[in-house]
Amino acid sequence: MDRQMLIKEAIQAREGAYVPYSRFQVGAALLMKDGSVIRGANIENASYGLTNCAERTALFKAYSEGRRDVVAIAVVADTKRPVPPCGACRQVMAELCPADTKVYLGNLQGDIQEITVSELLPGAFTAEDMND
């Protein structure tokens, strides 16, 4: 699957967003090693701190189903520039994905930025930092 197809999956994932407060729909799509796709959307809460971003929704869904073979991630929102992940999502990606995992950031105008997980969060705190 090419990056454009994965971006389309993320655009479709936006439709599952629960955003009654901000109306800011974000979709994410994970490409798995076997070629399958796992989607996620952002889910808001009246207590904003409990909101879950699309990237984390997709990753937690994959992991909860025993799927840990992420090859690429696409994230899309209706923004002027390709939508950047928040700090929490960057940390979760650094924990759950290989450092060289491709991340495609996009918007509805078709702009795409390609980056890797390690480039999103240089010097990430990981499990290796906890081992002696």
From Swiss-Prot:
EC number of the protein: 3.5.4.5
Catalysed reaction equations from the record: cytidine + H2O + H(+) = uridine + NH4(+); 2'-deoxycytidine + H2O + H(+) = 2'-deoxyuridine + NH4(+)
Family annotation (InterPro entries): APOBEC/CMP_deaminase_Zn-bd, CMP_dCMP_dom, Cyt/Deoxycyt_deaminase, Cyt_deam_tetra, Cytidine_deaminase-like
Annotated keywords: Hydrolase, Metal-binding, Zinc
Record bears the keyword DNA repair: no
Any Gene Ontology CC annotation: cytosol
Cofactor(s), by name: Zn(2+)
Every CMP/dCMP-type deaminase domain range: 1-128
Root EC class: hydrolase
Protein's job: This enzyme scavenges exogenous and endogenous cytidine and 2'-deoxycytidine for UMP synthesis.
Official protein name in the record: Cytidine deaminase
Organism for this UniProt entry: Halalkalibacterium halodurans (strain ATCC BAA-125 / DSM 18197 / FERM 7344 / JCM 9153 / C-125)
Upper classification of the organism: Bacteria, Bacillati, Bacillota, Bacilli, Bacillales
